[in-house]
């Protein structure tokens, strides 16, 4: 059996990834594929926390003329919808899963309580953190960094639509250069689109490495936790 490099991981999945090729809403084939990949690493004994974005349902910046705070709260609720969808896919595969929300909705999910989240992880349950940080003006990238620090995750697995970090958008520019390794400071100084600056700074302050990889290739999550060379690694 291959050695496991990371025992406890924080998986960040963008809302757009859940939408698949539709670009909007939830593609349950994609949700089931992601759930299958999560199950693979849970079966290895890895403890998994997850944060799902909400961009497939609502983006705060789309609310033109809308109060920013209201738009952000709508985005937080969108992440809850995605979290419940992913929970359903995981539980259909017999993976014990809990959703914890930063905004209380007790009939739907548990409130975020750090000690309870840690206990779930220790028992082998997947914990999906929804509702952002519970505060407007903070992205789900920042949520992932914050929760990763709180649960003492070994790494953040940043699953995206591209297979790593580039100096410019590889979908638009054929000459885009991919980075294999970056430091936190390089990401901040070059303004590379890994995570937003708040999230990157939080990871830097708590020395949490970030692995950026493409979600469209099956088996990438497993490869990442086993320490195989994949995507881009951001660290000290």
From Swiss-Prot:
Coiled coil: none
Positions of region (Involved in allosteric activation by GTP): 20-25
InterPro entries, alphabetized: AceGlu_kinase-like_sf (IPR036393), Asp/Glu/Uridylate_kinase (IPR001048), Glu/AcGlu_kinase (IPR001057), Uridylate_kinase (IPR011817), Uridylate_kinase_bac (IPR015963)
Protein name: Uridylate kinase
Biological role stated in the UniProt entry: Catalyzes the reversible phosphorylation of UMP to UDP.
Binding locations of ATP: 12-15, 55, 59, 166, 169
Pfam families linked to this entry: AA_kinase
SUPFAM superfamilies: Carbamate kinase-like
Family according to the record: Belongs to the UMP kinase family.
Metabolic or biological pathway, per its Swiss-Prot or TrEMBL entry: Pyrimidine metabolism; CTP biosynthesis via de novo pathway; UDP from UMP (UMPK route): step 1/1
Record's GO cellular component terms: cytoplasm
Catalysed reactions, as listed in the record: UMP + ATP = UDP + ADP
